[in-house]
């Protein structure tokens, strides 16, 4: 039988093939923060839990959830965006004695390797462009980007029109050392699993506010990484999802 790349990945990330972890070697905990661009604009967000929702039936949310690629021209409010960010990466607490966060989504060993980048197209109070969520502070930072960053990222996502037509597109990146520090190469498995947890939360959160989501795995890794200004090795794009208001 052919030894495929996928088969090699599964084999080489088995426990029997792992080296000693950085944690076991006494290497310091990875940083939970990325540096901010010099002079970058930091934007306060409303509290994520402050959004007033109609009384919801959770079973109905789960049952009604579906992938939606067509959105209306209605803007997302800043309060709604804050709610979506809090529900997908929100920090509930930080341990006193170590840099470990408890969040609104599960993560292997509470490692939480992800950063959330946002392509903003149609959100009230925000200029269109590229942003990053500062989860520990519950703020946004606007990132330097070409004027046509929407077109660049749409092309990087194989010209899927719902990227351009979304109110916002979520780009999750993995800072791999946050996970591999403890779990070595097996940590790559966990990062992909964790991405599913985050995106499923987005689907359900969106359903509760009349929005639709389409998760995207079909993208050019190198083009997306370049557009987000990440190196593709230490930090790389791992999952994408478009979001906008549903048709009535």
What label would you give each PLM region?
Residues 1-169, 176-177, 195, 209, ...:
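N-terminal accessory segments that position/regulate proteins before the catalytic core
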Residues 178-182:
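Short acidic/His/Gly/Ser-rich catalytic and metal-binding motifs that mark active-site loops
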Residues 186-194:
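Short pre-catalytic strand/loop immediately N-terminal to key active-site residues, enriched for Gly-Thr
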Residues 198-203, 207-208, 212:
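C-terminal folded domains that constitute the principal catalytic or ligand-binding module
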């Amino acid at each position: 039988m052919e030894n495929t790349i996928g088969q090699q990945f599964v084999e080489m990330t088995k426990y029997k093939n792992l080296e000693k972890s950085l944690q076991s070697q006494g290497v310091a905990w990875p940083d939970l923060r990325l540096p901010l661009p010099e002079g970058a604009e930091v934007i306060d967000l409303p509290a994520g839990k402050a959004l007033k929702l109609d009384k919801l039936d959770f079973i109905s949310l789960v049952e009604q959830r579906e992938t939606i690629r067509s959105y209306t021209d209605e803007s997302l409010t800043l309060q709604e965006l804050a709610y979506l960010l809090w529900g997908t990466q929100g920090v509930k607490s930080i341990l006193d004695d170590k840099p470990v966060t408890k969040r609104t989504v599960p993560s292997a060993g509470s490692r939480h390797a992800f950063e959330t980048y946002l392509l903003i197209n149609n959100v009230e109070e925000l200029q269109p462009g590229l942003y990053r969520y500062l989860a520990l502070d519950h703020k946004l930072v606007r990132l330097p980007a070409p004027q046509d960053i929407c077109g660049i990222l749409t092309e990087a996502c194989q010209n899927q029109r719902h990227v351009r037509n979304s109110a916002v597109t979520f780009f999750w990146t993995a800072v791999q050392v946050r996970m591999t520090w403890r779990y070595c190469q097996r940590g790559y498995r966990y990062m992909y699993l964790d991405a599913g947890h985050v995106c499923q939360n987005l689907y359900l959160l969106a359903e509760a506010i009349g929005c639709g989501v389409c998760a995207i795995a079909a993208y050019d890794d190198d083009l997306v990484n370049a557009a987000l200004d990440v190196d593709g090795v230490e930090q790389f794009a791992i999952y994408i999802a478009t979001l906008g208001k549903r048709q009535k």
